[in-house]
């Protein structure tokens, strides 16, 4: 059910009415009808009556909160305390919230919103005769459905929606006309280059932070619930699986609850890699392949689910949907899934040569480039989508929720990102692209060794969608044409 708030304009009267008459002139808003009324006016001059009439006709800001409170998971605060922290607007106070969250808080005409990396959050500002209405949800189609229910769908276009960027408090004042301009306050600013060049030290810190986040998350999972890891045998999913295996053992949890789910579309290399990874460590019994047909991939369905059209993200989300569909068919009650999304972003392990906008200098020298894109206020920053993983996390979030899973990647947590940003990439790589690509395996393998004592196999990087099936097969099923995917998305609202 939507929660609604109406900002009473009674505060607008404060200071307009003189001390003698102020007590007798109170404007109220009926909580059910949102109708305005002025009570107790007995002796007003014409000038004062006009002033109060203008105040009475001031806009009433209205907020509709479509976010699901149960979708927030906090480690150290209650929901109400978390909202109060967002309301405060204090970056330090919001940064101290531990967990997954998408929150808004209101006071008067002011609205503040904030989210963690793994909880997409969107808003739309609708115009009504009595003032603006701010609608907030985790999905574009939820915003549209509410507008349609109110007969306001004529105002809607998906490009008019806005995404709350991760790691920022967004402040709006519902003043009616002109449209309010959002103000952004960063609440997470990791210190860059704070570590030495000792890879063992870096690995211990990085995987140690990963294990800490997994321990917090596992404590919220009911003790009889199974835990699945979306597993390819790559560096990130491998680290998540081995750290989870280790932490569950340390916490005295039953390891028979743990599975490594690997998607296979028939001819991809991931299943062989996953099997080799686990067999080398004597952990092959945890592997559970999930087979699917390549023909089951549907780019149009994926665009509808993730509400985005970037080809690489649509491909990756299609794999998550296929994996989730297979797990759900086999285990109708399964709920909890872990994955390694965000690991590439943290250790800057994307092919620079595939993006003509990037150089190794821009990748290494820009704070959280892969997590946030070029950044709020920058020329290329998208108000509709934000940037980086802040935008693309819907490939995991929306795809897992579509099949009823509660997913989590510890790589998205600030405590883990903070360690990654502290790595002195320039010193360690000498601005060499091959050295940058090799660094991730070195850091993670050393960290896993320090945490678990296991020698983690490290295989060459491969995207999820290129491991579940061969690239040429994928391309026949899902053409790499962004314009077509964008048109499919826009057609949903045409």
Identify what each model region corresponds to:
Residues 2-3, 14, 109-112, 191-452, ...:
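ATP-dependent adenylate-handling active sites, centered on carboxylate activation for C-N bond formation
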Residues 2-20, 25-28, 34-290:
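Cysteine-centered catalytic environments shared across enzyme families
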Residues 482-484:
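Non-catalytic structural connector segments
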Residues 453-462:
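A short alpha-helix-loop-beta-strand transition element characteristic
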